[in-house]
Amino acid sequence: MRVVIQRVKGAILSVRKENIGENEKELEIISEIKNGLICFLGIHKNDTWEDALYIIRKCLNLRLWNNDNKTWDKNVKDLNYELLIVSQFTLFGNTKKGNKPDFHLAKEPNEALIFYNKIIDEFKKQYNDDKIKIGKFGNYMNIDVTNDGPVTIYIDTHDINLNK
């Protein structure tokens, strides 16, 4: 599992409105956060629940904010901030051959949706239902992000030994 975590002052996620023509570009906002983290989540075809729990723990507990006296001392929960979790299979785009990305390492969409929903439920269970916002799985999304720092962290559970 891969996650790109960005510390943000705000993020707005929009999708194309339902019931409009294919050529229309009108968007509607479905998720918005103020201070917090945007987490772009890629699910590998071989990911397990242990991978998910590791990513959830890191997203909720990484100390990415300063305290009055210490740097890198507070996490999203300490500050009662929000998270926007966005499924992004393109994190497993392989570009080793040619110029067209190959996404065969990403989990199959139907299976990924079930796993993603379980991950979101666990985020809400471990933190606060009202503080977890999501994108729309499998849809085109427009995301406006105001980075804070910038602070960007990349985690790949396949780089870590999770008792595999």
From Swiss-Prot:
Summary of the function given for this chain in its UniProt record: D-aminoacyl-tRNA deacylase, with no observable activity on tRNAs charged with their cognate L-amino acid. Probably acts by rejecting L-amino acids from its binding site rather than specific recognition of D-amino acids. Catalyzes the hydrolysis of D-tyrosyl-tRNA(Tyr), has no activity on correctly charged L-tyrosyl-tRNA(Tyr). Hydrolyzes correctly charged, achiral, glycyl-tRNA(Gly). Deacylates mischarged D.melanogaster and E.coli glycyl-tRNA(Ala). Probably acts via tRNA-based rather than protein-based catalysis.
Major localization class: cytoplasm
Enzyme class: hydrolase
Protein name: D-aminoacyl-tRNA deacylase
Domain description: A Gly-cisPro motif from one monomer fits into the active site of the other monomer to allow specific chiral rejection of L-amino acids.
Family listed: Belongs to the DTD family.
Reported impact of residue 112 to F: Loss of deacylation of D-tyrosyl-tRNA(Tyr), loss of deacylation of glycyl-tRNA(Gly), not toxic upon overexpression
EC number in record: 3.1.1.96
Residues that coordinate or bind tRNA: 72, 89
Gene: DTD
GO-annotated cellular components: cytoplasm
Motif Gly-cisPro motif, allows the protein to recognize chirality of D-amino acids: chain residues: 149-150
